[in-house]
Amino acid sequence: MAVRIRMKKMGRTHRPFFRVCAVDQRNPRDGRVIEELGTYDPMCPETDARTTLKADRVDYWIGVGAQPSDKVAVLIKKYGTDGSHLEAQKAAVERLGRRKDYTPPPEAPAPKAAPVAEAPAEEAPAEEPAAEASTDDAPAAEATTE
């Protein structure tokens, strides 16, 4: 059985996401995998934070004779055990992990709430005289029919 280390496509339309997997060479791209070795997210804003690899497992599979695909070979070279971009990757992951400071919304919406509270109070008395007028008309109509 010839094993390859290649990417399995996940995600959705216009939002790709890949898993780096050890796969039998004869299986289709998104078919059954032997082991998942990491991820690759091309949509991540930080270039060096796009890839996560289990370096020890990648080394194991390469040691047993697995052949990486071209793109995976580049990722292993950069982010593998002795990768050239490991320090940049750690810094990028830290930048992504930080939460943005919370800024409270401006105070402008508060004055708008006060006039809204007065408006329903004005409408309520306007409805009451209309109800009284209808009750006054009813007895007058009965008196004329008699």
Curated annotation (Swiss-Prot):
Q: Where is the composition biased (Acidic residues)?
A: 120-130
Q: Which domain of life is it from?
A: Bacteria
Q: Which SUPFAM superfamilies match?
A: Ribosomal protein S16
InterPro entries assigned: Ribosomal_bS16, Ribosomal_bS16_dom_sf
Q: Which is one Gene Ontology cellular component term of this protein? A: small ribosomal subunit
Query: Where is there biased composition of kind Basic and acidic residues?
Result: 84-102
Q: Which GO terms describe its molecular function?
A: structural constituent of ribosome
Region of interest (Disordered), ranges:
84-146
What's one Pfam family the UniProt record gives for this protein? Ribosomal_S16
Q: Where is the composition biased (Low complexity)?
A: 110-119, 131-146
Which GO biological process annotations does it have? Answer: translation
Keyword Ribonucleoprotein listed:
yes
Keywords assigned by UniProt, alphabetized: Ribonucleoprotein, Ribosomal protein
What family is this protein classified in?
Belongs to the bacterial ribosomal protein bS16 family.
Q: Check the record and name the HAMAP family matching this protein.
A: Ribosomal_bS16 (MF_00385)
Which NCBIfam families does this chain map to? S16
Q: What is the name of this protein?
A: Small ribosomal subunit protein bS16
